[in-house]
Amino acid sequence: MEPSLIDVRRALHRIPELGFEEYKTQTYLLDLIQSLPQDFLEVKTWKTGILVRVGGRKGEKTVAYRADMDGLPITEETGLPFVSQHEGRMHACGHDLHMTIAFGLLRHFAYHQPETHLLFIFQPAEEGPGGAKPMLDSEEFRMWWPDEIIALHIAPEYPVGTIATRKGLLFANTSELFIDLKGQGGHAAYPHLANDMVVAASHLVTQLQSVVSRNVDPLDSAVVTIGVIKGGTKQNIIAETARIEGTIRTLSIESMKKVKKRIEALVSGIEIGFSCQASIDYGSNYCQVWNDEERVARFIEYSQGREGVTFIECSEAMTGEDFGYFLEEIPGFMFWLGVDTNYGLHDARLNPNEDVLSFAVQHLIGYIETL
């Protein structure tokens, strides 16, 4: 007897793994895929990801569907009977649901051959360091290059049955931010003989609050958030080093350039003002998610005409998603899928309504069959 969608989701929820470490997840999915009829399936692996091609009856084009695979470094607090078995790891962004929906679609089309070719993409490392771009550039992917591509992301705030998306920009440009400061440590009783990097970091964090408000057009939008400050070893030792970690998010590419330029100027000022050395690392950078207008309009029209579906034309979000790299080269779209839970993405208590699994699979089967 084949597992239900809920069974699959719960099995995946128990084994969350970080980016490019999704070995158990890959093995579990491959076992599921191998249990399906193989008459028109072809399977490739890339690192910890999986590509599955479903040969269509006509095969005039290839439609791709992408699901991300990785979990987050979060200790789960849901208290569910299928809680994460990996300490300090959790599917707190819904990727367990994303994979389950993709498998549900794949299973349907393994039994019911589609008109067109389909490509199912199980992509590792969306949360970091970023799996989309290297997967897109891989030989394995380029052998099965699709003509269009689709993806979704769960939305805790919307009820089950809700689809939300928009033409054009959906998600922001994002960049990590790491700033390291190095000065001169010393005894707390002799501050004049040291260069205190805790004080320097504190000044810099305060200055960073003006980057958006005084440099970005108020009709545009940007965010600079500092999430971590590290510095010092003991209460009576002046810190020799400090580290600031944060994120930058902008709706426009120009604003991203402007924000980074301003941050670099402020860091240079800190170097002069506190006689220290500083370095900046932008870590992972994700480009914007830009929905192809023609294709997303077709999906919107389809969704609005379906009984039991509530469609919302949403605003842009500051969310980061490496699916944007696929959309840079392949026309397609992404949409929000309501999962009706009180807790947000990346929350240790996130508990999506599992009724969404069958809803999403049936909705997407119907849409794909129109292509």
Swiss-Prot record:
Instruction: Please verify whether the record's keywords include Hydrolase.
Output: yes
Assigned keywords, A-Z? Amino-acid biosynthesis, Diaminopimelate biosynthesis, Hydrolase, Lysine biosynthesis
List of catalytic residues: D68, E127 (proton acceptor)
Give the pathway annotation: Amino-acid biosynthesis; L-lysine biosynthesis via DAP pathway; LL-2,6-diaminopimelate from (S)-tetrahydrodipicolinate (acetylase route): step 3/3
Q: Can you provide one Gene Ontology molecular function annotated for this UniProt record?
A: N-acetyldiaminopimelate deacetylase activity
Catalysed reaction(s) here are: N-acetyl-(2S,6S)-2,6-diaminopimelate + H2O = (2S,6S)-2,6-diaminopimelate + acetate
Q: Which InterPro entries match?
A: AcetylDAP_deacetylase, Amidohydrolase, Bact_exopeptidase_dim_dom, Peptidase_M20, Peptidase_M20_dimer
Kindly give the NCBIfam families that the UniProt entry links to this protein.
Answer: amidohydrolases
Q: What does this protein do?
A: Catalyzes the conversion of N-acetyl-diaminopimelate to diaminopimelate and acetate.
Name-wise, this protein is: N-acetyldiaminopimelate deacetylase
Q: What organism does this protein naturally occur in?
A: Halalkalibacterium halodurans (strain ATCC BAA-125 / DSM 18197 / FERM 7344 / JCM 9153 / C-125)
